[in-house]
From Swiss-Prot:
The lineage of its organism: Bacteria, Pseudomonadati, Pseudomonadota, Gammaproteobacteria, Vibrionales. The keyword Ribosomal protein does not apply. The gene is napA. Predicted to be exported by the Tat system. The position of the signal peptide cleavage has not been experimentally proven. Its EC number is 1.9.6.1. Disulfide bonds: none annotated. It catalyses: 2 Fe(II)-[cytochrome] + nitrate + 2 H(+) = 2 Fe(III)-[cytochrome] + nitrite + H2O. GO terms for molecular function: 4 iron, 4 sulfur cluster binding; electron transfer activity; iron ion binding; molybdenum ion binding; molybdopterin cofactor binding; nitrate reductase (cytochrome) activity; nitrate reductase activity. Mo-bis(molybdopterin guanine dinucleotide) binds at residues 85, 152, 177, 181, 214-221, 245-249, 264-266, 374, 378, 484, 510-511, 533, 560, 718-727, 802, 819. It is an enzyme of class 1 (oxidoreductase). Residues 41-97 form the 4Fe-4S Mo/W bis-MGD-type domain. It comes from Vibrio cholerae serotype O1 (strain ATCC 39315 / El Tor Inaba N16961). Keywords: 4Fe-4S, Electron transport, Iron, Iron-sulfur, Metal-binding, Molybdenum, Nitrate assimilation, Oxidoreductase, Periplasm, Signal, Transport. This is Periplasmic nitrate reductase. It is found in: Periplasm.
């Protein structure tokens, strides 16, 4: 072994120390001390695998394994910091129960719905899958097959899945788990601005004078961003932090003003603030007159339940997202009932506190950053709440300038970059296009080299609807990738599990671990994780980041995109397209979906020589497939306000915020001088709308679908904790994180506990008409609910708390409300 001078000195020092201790140090031990090619750790960059913050980490690999990670000091997002989960990223891929081979339910050597999971080859797995898909497509058509994806998919994985489903199988029945976390944010952006994703960026943290958290525990869910708020608050005494929530949590520890409100009453609070702005002559008339229109939303729209549900039948305008033009005077009249007294009565927040909050929005000299996560999004009126907060910023002109920013925080690493931008929702296409728009379908068909009429015009089944259709036998072949919906989704017992175990259905789950969802499937496919593949994520501030594959995958695992693309080889075009479509493209006869979708002269145009040596997918397919998928996808957004840089550029930087025009990223959208798409002389240009004007939309307070009653007398709120991410598939396999928080607890007010004869640590039964769970009571600790409400996190697979949640959704976004349902609690004898 060749040794450097530094290594020689270190080795001699070690030998001297050993001699003093009376120890003889063998020559073979020197490589424990000396640096060499064999012992060196190789470092490369990658975005974190967890939340939507988009921290960059340095990944240390040695002997084909990830052995260490650290915060990337060159990253503008996290500036070298990680949260506790990020510091243990090196361990997420090496759980003892990592799946390494396909598993098929079999009995007597054949597939059987009630059989035992048995290892099979990939060929066998795909043979069975293809047989089921072809039979379903032949007998029941494209609407009988579906896919449930993820905001954790890489950009390329989501894009490949969209192409296979919407162009190949001609089914729009593809939806991401981002439906459960970001759908209301999407619809809110589209209604108000005509284009998706935040206009601000993380630079706003260093400019704002007031932060308002509307249902977001950033201290635990976005801790790295919370450090930036903390630094701003502690470094600038005039800065104020406001936290609104239905229970006390760690973000309140920094708050200057905390507001505990009754569930659903945030609607009343936001309307009061708008009324306060008007009554106190704080409207920025120059901005409002030049850049906004006033609209009235249709009300009494139901709760996204099944059509035969009594609440849905009762709604006068079920599922309607219609709006009508109104004048400012009509808007003023619509918010006038929301006096401080009325808002206090509805919300439980004192009048003086409400006025304190309203003054910060009304003060023209106070830059306000509004932030929200699941507290606002997982809400049966989540879209309305988005609009109501945008109203406050539009009325005052506090938008799209440094420190003035309504900002939706994402929970998954690529809920923006993949679910939203790629368009993996049942109604969307890339770059904010939708399947219902014939012009948009024509654009997609042109980019994809498909005959006119390939993409269906009717939106597919959204996430909650997919569960219902599986249960009803309408949806029969279903592929779940990169999510654990059997644990994460609502109403498990009544709507989801029956569909998975319906004997008419064939369920495939692609995952790295045997999750609750995988255990309910018929076929489980082992999946590559994080830096076992090359990929790209898009974070909450529109920052696209890419990474190289850095280690080989475990066992026979493959990336989600490899699985999708390889599966496409099993289908001839004649198997899936009708004759009238084939007649428009006779050149495709006899070709596979792989030939048409992925070997199309675009995806395969970048040679293998451009890829790194360690790139399993590229070597398998024979070309630089990640670059090909990315560049074809990027064609949708370039020149249309979603411009991405060339793929190779992203490997050289710590991400870029789109639109990227002439090599320059965009920090603040819609603002002249910052956004290249804002017209000269406009000041602000909300170009997502045809006339460049944003909408101020009036929406009232409406009660939730269920309220506590004599039998079910407590509110239940579900959510997350710092140490675990979502359902804990990764974090619960990290020993340090598991030991820190091994179990989900029921956080409860001590007086509610005493009234039921309960003490801290007692095991209780939480129940309602949909199910029951056993959990231990916690009357202290980080989360402190008010009387009448309990909080239980959903990371614990042994406590499937979401079985208690009603599958009510926002009728406009189809996003489930996980934050409020009635339950009762009894002590386990």
């Amino acid at each position: 072994m060749k040794m450097t001078r530094r290594a020689f000195v270190k080795a001699n020092a070690a030998a001297s120390a050993a001699a003093v201790a009376g120890i003889t140090l063998p020559a073979s031990a020197t490589n424990l001390i000396a640096s060499s090619d064999q012992t060196a750790i190789h470092w490369d960059k990658a975005p974190c695998r967890f939340c939507g913050t988009g921290c960059s980490v340095l990944v240390g690999t040695q002997d084909g394994r990830v052995v260490a990670t650290q915060g990337d000091p060159e990253a503008p997002v996290n500036k070298g910091l990680n949260c506790i989960k990020g510091y243990f990223l090196s361990k997420i891929m090496y759980g003892q129960d990592r799946l390494k081979t396909p598993l098929l339910r079999m009995k007597d050597g054949q597939y059987h719905k009630d059989g035992e999971f048995t290892p099979v080859s990939w060929d066998t797995a795909f043979d069975v899958m293809a047989e089921k898909w072809k039979a379903s497509l032949k007998t029941k058509g494209p609407t009988s097959v579906g896919m449930f994806g993820s905001g954790q998919w890489t950009v390329m994985e989501g894009y490949a899945a969209v192409k296979l489903m919407k162009a190949g199988f001609r089914s729009n029945n593809i939806d991401p788990n981002a439906r459960h976390c970001m759908a209301s944010a999407v619809v809110g952006f589209m209604r108000t601005f005509g284009i998706d994703e935040p206009m601000g960026c993380y630079d706003d943290f260093e400019h704002a004078d007031a932060f308002v958290l509307w249902g977001s525990n950033m201290a635990e869910m976005h801790p790295v961003l919370w450090t930036r708020i903390t630094d701003r608050r502690l470094s600038h005494p005039h800065v104020k932090v406001n936290v609104l929530s239905t229970y006390y949590h760690r973000s309140f520890e920094l708050a200057d003003h905390g507001y505990i409100f009754h569930p659903q009453s945030d609607l009343a609070i936001a309307n009061f603030i708008a009324n306060y702005i008007i009554q106190n002559d704080a409207v920025n008339w120059d901005f409002v007159n030049k850049h906004t229109h006033f609209k009235q939303a249709v009300t009494d729209i139901g709760y996204g339940l099944r059509d035969d549900h009594p609440l849905q039948k009762k709604a006068k305008n079920a599922n309607s997202g219609d709006v009508s033009d109104i004048s400012f005077e009509e808007y003023k009249k619509s918010v006038a009932p929301y006096t401080v007294e009325k808002a206090s009565e509805i919300s439980g927040v004192s009048p003086d506190k409400l006025i304190t909050l309203a003054k910060q929005y009304a003060d023209p000299n106070t830059k306000v950053m509004s932030l929200w996560t699941m507290g606002m999004n997982q809400h049966t009126r989540g879209v309305w709440m988005q609009s109501l907060v945008y109203n406050l910023h539009l009325l005052t002109g506090k938008i799209a300038t440094p420190g003035n920013s309504p900002f939706s925080l994402t929970g998954q690493p690529s809920a923006c970059g993949t679910a939203r931008e790629v368009g993996t929702f049942a109604h969307r296409l890339p770059a904010d296009m939708v399947v219902a728009n014939p012009k948009h379908r024509a654009i997609a068909e042109k980019v994809w080299k498909l005959p006119e009429g390939t993409i269906p015009e009717k939106p597919g089944f959204h996430a909650v609807q997919q569960d219902r259709m599986l249960k009803d036998g309408v949806l029969n072949c279903y592929w779940v990738q990169c999510n654990n919906n059997m644990q994460a989704g609502p109403n498990i017992n009544e709507e989801r599990l029956p569909g998975y175990r319906n004997p008419e259905n064939f369920i495939v789950v692609s995952d790295a671990y045997p999750t609750v969802t995988a255990q309910a499937a018929d076929l489980v496919l082992p999946t590559a994780m994080w830096v076992e593949k090359e990929g790209a994520y898009g974070n909450a501030e529109r920052r696209t980041q890419v990474w190289y594959q850095q280690v080989k995958t475990v066992g026979e695992s493959h990336s989600d995109s490899w699985q999708v693309i390889e599966f496409s080889k099993r289908f001839k075009v004649e198997d899936v397209w009708p004759e009238e479509l084939l007649a428009k493209a006779p050149q495709y006869r006899g070709k596979t979906l792989y030939d048409v979708l992925f070997k199309n002269g675009q995806v395969d145009k970048f040679p293998l020589s451009e890829a790194r040596e360690l790139n399993d997918d590229a070597h398998h397919f024979g070309f630089y497939i990640q670059k090909g998928l990315f560049e074809e996808y990027a064609e949708f957004g370039r020149g249309h306000g979603h411009d991405l840089a060339p793929y190779d550029v992203y490997h050289q930087v710590r991400g870029l915020r789109w639109p990227v025009v002439d090599g320059k990223e965009t920090k603040w959208r819609f603002k002249e001088g910052s956004d290249p798409y804002a017209k000269a002389g406009s000041g602000w240009d909300f170009y997502g709308k045809p006339d460049g004007k944003a909408w101020i939309i009036s929406s009232p307070y409406e009660a939730p679908p269920e309220m506590p009653n004599e039998e079910y007398d407590l509110w239940l709120c579900t959510g997350r904790v710092l140490e675990h991410w979502h359902t804990g598939t990764m974090t619960r396999r990290v020993p340090e994180l598991y030991k820190a928080v091994p179990d989900a607890l029921c956080f409860m007010h001590h007086e509610d506990a005493q009234a039921r004869g309960l003490r801290r640590g007692d095991e209780v039964l939480i129940s309602n008409s949909r199910g029951e769970v056993r959990v231990r009571v916690e009357t202290r600790g980080r989360n402190k609910p008010p009387k009448g409400l309990v909080f239980v996190p959903f990371f614990d697979a042994r406590i499937l708390v979401n079985k208690l949640i009603l599958d009510a959704t926002d009728p406009l976004s189809k996003q489930t409300d996980f934050k409020k349902c009635p339950v009762k609690i009894t002590k386990v004898a």
